[in-house]
């Protein structure tokens, strides 16, 4: 009865449909924009800016008349010009790697002041791409078949994690305490029934997540054709470079969401069962069911909560995702902790 009631409430409840539509929109909208979110675009912008600044201030003198700092700048400009003029991805990566390596030496010596972490990420990006054997670097999001929506999905899906089981559990409890259905008089279900409730919540939550992802996947499939599920990805985790594929990332993301939803769902079902017997009433039940999700609902917790460190990849906020996933991050999410990780080579 609980399982049938839950399914009926989900199908009839407007909140469930609204939640699914929001998920679908969040995962689908980014695909409609042919955004140049991949590393080479931003790297070339930075190099061009450096070359322009160097040409403006460079003295008209021979190499012997340059100071050590000016000689280093001239060397950087030479690598930057070579990268900008490169006709192949391999040539670009070779010159860019030399550029960022020399820039890194400047950060270490103190002769260059700026965002050292971003420079290190760019250097890691070049090295990882070179070692992965990629022969064609996508210039924009839609150049990567089928998976162009995946960077945004990785960035935003963890933010939706607390809301799905919270919504479904609340629907279950509020429905179970309505006078017209089970009301507060209903006895606590037996263990077998409790297990059915938990799995119903998990199944419904997973279905809603997949329903949210499906429109984006279908749209990307129609736009680009079925593409490179084995597209190589390299990322830093606990200070080590690890390689995987886009398909593995997508699978791991769904498993992580399912595991998190399961944990919250079990807590919610146990609490709701206890409160219906001891403190009957829809308001009390709903508040206690929501309790496991509260720590994850704050803005700061969504970005830095320890639970999100369980994900196999770095977690980026949606704002960073729109501009930097596919390139390299502007900061290390969770830096200073033992579980800090950073996406170095994007999709």
Where are these regions (language model features)?
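Aromatic- and glycine-rich beta-strand/loop motifs that create alpha-glucan
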Residues: 1-20
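Short loop-to-helix capping motifs
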Residues: 10-14, 189, 276-278
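Hydrophobic membrane-insertion alpha-helices, especially the h-region
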Residues: 16-32
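Secretory targeting signals
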Residues: 28-57, 127-175, 195-273, 320-328, ...
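Long, solvent-exposed extracytoplasmic domains/loops
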Residues: 51-143
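Short helix-to-coil transition segments within interhelical loops
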Residues: 183-191
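Transmembrane helix segments
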Residues: 275-310
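Short hydrophobic, aromatic-rich alpha-helical segments embedded in or entering the lipid bilayer
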Residues: 303-327
């Amino acid at each position: 009865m609980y399982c049938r009631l839950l399914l009926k409430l989900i199908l009839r409840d407007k909140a469930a449909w609204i939640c699914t539509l929001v998920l679908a929109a969040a995962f689908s909208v980014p695909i409609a924009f042919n955004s140049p979110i991949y590393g080479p675009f931003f790297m070339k912008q930075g190099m061009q800016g450096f070359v322009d600044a160097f040409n403006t201030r460079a003295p008209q003198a021979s190499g012997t008349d340059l100071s050590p700092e000016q000689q280093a700048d001239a060397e950087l400009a030479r690598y930057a010009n070579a990268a900008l003029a490169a006709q192949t991805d391999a040539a670009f990566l070779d010159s860019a790697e030399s550029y960022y390596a020399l820039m890194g030496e400047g950060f270490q010596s103190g002769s260059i002041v700026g965002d050292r972490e971003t420079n290190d990420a760019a250097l890691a990006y070049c090295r990882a791409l070179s070692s992965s054997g990629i022969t064609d670097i996508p210039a924009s999001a839609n150049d990567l078949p089928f998976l162009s929506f995946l960077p945004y999905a990785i960035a935003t899906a963890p933010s939706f994690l607390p809301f799905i089981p919270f919504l479904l559990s609340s629907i279950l409890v509020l429905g179970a305490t309505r006078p017209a259905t089970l009301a507060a008089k209903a006895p606590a279900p037996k263990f077998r029934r409790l297990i059915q409730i938990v799995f119903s919540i998990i199944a419904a939550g997973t279905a809603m997540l997949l329903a949210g992802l499906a429109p984006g996947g279908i749209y990307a499939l129609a736009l680009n054709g079925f593409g490179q599920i084995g597209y190589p990805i390299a990322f830093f985790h606990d200070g080590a470079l690890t390689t995987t594929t886009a398909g593995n990332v997508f699978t791991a993301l769904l498993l992580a969401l399912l595991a998190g939803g399961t944990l919250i769902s079990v807590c919610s079902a146990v609490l709701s069962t206890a409160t219906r017997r001891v403190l009957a009433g829809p308001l009390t039940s709903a508040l206690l069911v929501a309790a496991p999700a509260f720590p994850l609902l704050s803005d700061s917790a969504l970005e830095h909560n320890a639970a999100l460190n369980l994900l196999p990849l770095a977690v980026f906020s949606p704002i960073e995702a729109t501009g930097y996933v596919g390139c390299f991050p502007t900061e290390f999410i969770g830096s200073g902790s033992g579980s800090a990780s950073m996406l170095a080579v994007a999709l």
